């Protein structure tokens, strides 16, 4: 206190600081009211269940005879190209978009130059990414999904657990889920992560093995609420 030249009595807030705090609150209240008014006009997820059934009927027919061997993250990307163009989805990845294959073709990047984007490049911030997606999912205006390697689910655990406790429905796309993958060595090769995820109450874990299972997993995941 001496170094900061703070001479106020304990538990006393100086009047000038209190004014700054209250001015900030009033300013933010106005922004909040404007945001709430704008969001009330967004259709959001009102017609989501009907959209899912119709769209996935089309997707299932499209890929019914698909039998080319490919990584399920590529199958997931093919599904995402369909659904992100038709639904209110908000996506992102923790510095692994090119590896997770989580960005739909039509999705714009959200950044300081474009606040209308539906996709965020989070950088190496798995926990922050999951926390932000929880917040967006809690608005009920968007279905959210985010991607990283399965081995990095450990970094997201607090946010994953909170999503389950809050009974919200963000989707996590965990790729490279095999000990046979990962040229970067053991840090990128998941062992115990699947068991950890399956032990979280009020959570669902799907591991598709081919194109049609990937289609089915996306459909079920989007219907969970």
Model-derived segments and spans:
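Histidine-centered active-site/metal-ligand motif
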Residues: 1-2, 7, 176, 188
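Thiamine diphosphate
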Residues: 19, 24-225
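Conserved phosphoryl-transfer catalytic core
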Residues: 2-19
């Amino acid at each position: 206190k001496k170094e900061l030249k703070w001479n106020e009595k304990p538990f006393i807030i100086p009047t000038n600081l209190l004014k700054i705090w209250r001015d900030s609150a009033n300013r933010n209240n106005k922004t909040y009211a404007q945001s709430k008014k704008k969001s009330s006009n967004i259709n959001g997820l009102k017609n989501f269940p009907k959209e899912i059934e119709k769209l996935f009927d089309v997707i299932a027919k499209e890929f019914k005879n698909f039998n080319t061997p490919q990584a399920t993250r590529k199958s997931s990307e093919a599904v995402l190209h369909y659904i992100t163009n038709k639904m209110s989805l908000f996506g992102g990845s923790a510095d692994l978009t090119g590896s997770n294959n989580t960005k739909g073709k039509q999705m714009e990047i959200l950044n300081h130059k474009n606040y209308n984007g539906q996709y965020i490049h989070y950088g190496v911030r798995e926990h922050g990414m999951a926390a932000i997606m929880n917040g967006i999912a809690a608005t009920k205006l968007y279905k959210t999904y985010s991607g990283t390697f399965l081995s990095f689910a450990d970094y997201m655990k607090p946010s994953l657990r909170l999503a389950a406790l809050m009974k919200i429905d963000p989707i996590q796309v965990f790729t490279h889920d095999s000990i046979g993958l990962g040229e970067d060595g053991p840090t990128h090769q998941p062992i115990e992560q699947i068991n950890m995820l399956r032990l979280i109450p009020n959570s669902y874990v799907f591991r598709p093995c081919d194109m049609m299972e990937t289609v089915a997993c996306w459909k079920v995941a989007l219907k969970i609420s």
